[in-house]
Amino acid sequence: MAIKKGILFSLLILAFSLCANLTYGIAEQNRLKIEVIYFHATIRCESCLLIERQTRETIEQVYSTNLKDGTLSFSSLDFQDEQNSELAERYEIDSQTLIVQISNGSKVIKWKKLEKIWEYMNNYEKFRKYIVEEINEYLKEVKNGESKN
């Protein structure tokens, strides 16, 4: 009898653990997050490298907590690479472009091209302020759970 209770207890703990992990996985998958993506060409000029460097520095300095907790991510992709052609097509990318978007893991809910990066690239303070303002707008929506489409 004690063995049966022990086995039953072990099975209950196992079932509970599986359910908890499954629930966590689903919640994590549906969690809203900000993705900042810099699309660049295969051959890169100094201006393109500068924009990426300034964007990366800004994000790492201002949003280190968000990067660590997964609320925000930054990536740099070659839009001319065949692997990224679907994304380049989705966002109508034909030159170097910075995108900020809200997604819930598998679905992009809202996105925007940050077109003033070229205008501000030679003024780091304006560049940084512009990117921070745009990302903060999206972060507000994520924190408030407003972007649910």
Where are the regions that the model predicts?
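Bacterial N-terminal signal peptides that target proteins for export
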Residues: 1-11
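Bacterial N-terminal signal peptides
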Residues: 9-20
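Bacterial Sec-dependent signal peptides at the C-terminal "C-region" and cleavage site
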Residues: 18-30
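Local sequence-structure signature of Cys/Sec-based thiol-disulfide redox active-site neighborhoods
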Residues: 30-63
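Solvent-exposed, acidic/flexible segments
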Residues: 41-48, 52, 81, 120-128
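Charged, often glycine-rich, active-site loop that binds/positions anionic groups
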Residues: 85-94
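Non-catalytic, surface beta->alpha helical segment in thiol-disulfide oxidoreductase systems
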Residues: 100-144
